[in-house]
């Protein structure tokens, strides 16, 4: 089990890194804006995170078309060796994931809400897939069961590359703190 922090706050990242348990970070421009950061400085902020964190740093592209996502993904990946390009699980994102993964750029497909989406993400070349556990619960689904289904389905296939599941959007309840560790590789 690995623990990733979902934040753009450098103080939080440094604190968690000092505990010796932080395996990686996931972040996006919205989280960065909450720290007072400006979108045009997002890439520099990712560099600073990568200087703190040895493990993967998933940085989300805000581009919406295949070509824009690929361009942004290449720019993000060039920032540091441990950058993982975070891309929404949508048609344009799947196409961009295929292209980037063929270039050796690791991708985290985020906003995954179903087993078929997870399978498509893995087939497109995603290294990480992020099902949104808490958001399943928000729509009256059992998020932990959905997570278990995604993990079981992905583990059922050989995609020709490693795929890890990140339990994303985990809410602060006892069940959501303990249960993802039974299913996902990363929480």
Go through each PLM region and give its residues:
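Active-site beta->alpha loop and helix N-cap motifs at the rims of alpha/beta catalytic domains
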Residues: 4-5, 9-13, 19-22, 27-99
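Short active-site oxyanion
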Residues: 1-3, 21, 82-84, 105-107, ...
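Hydrophobic, well-structured mid-protein blocks that either form specific transmembrane helices
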Residues: 81, 85-129
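Glycine-rich beta-to-alpha transition loops that act as phosphate-gripper elements at the mouths
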Residues: 6-9, 63-67, 87-91, 109-115, ...
């Amino acid at each position: 089990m690995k623990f990733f922090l979902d934040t753009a706050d450098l103080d939080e990242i440094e604190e968690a890194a000092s505990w010796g348990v932080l395996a990686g970070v996931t972040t996006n421009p919205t989280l960065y804006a909450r720290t007072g950061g400006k979108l045009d400085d997002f890439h520099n902020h990712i560099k600073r995170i990568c200087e703190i964190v040895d493990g993967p740093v998933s940085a989300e592209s805000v581009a919406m078309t295949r070509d824009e996502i690929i361009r942004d993904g290449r720019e993000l990946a060039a920032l540091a060796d441990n950058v993982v390009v975070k891309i929404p699980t949508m048609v344009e994102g799947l196409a961009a994931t295929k292209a980037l993964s063929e270039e050796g750029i690791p991708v985290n497909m985020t906003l995954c809400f179903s087993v078929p989406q997870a399978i498509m993400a893995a087939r497109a070349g995603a290294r990480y897939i992020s099902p949104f556990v808490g958001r399943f619960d928000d729509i009256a689904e059992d998020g932990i069961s959905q997570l278990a289904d995604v993990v079981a389905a992905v583990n059922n296939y050989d995609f020709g590359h490693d795929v890890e599941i990140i339990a994303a959007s985990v809410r602060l309840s006892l069940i959501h703190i303990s249960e993802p560790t039974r299913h996902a590789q990363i929480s």
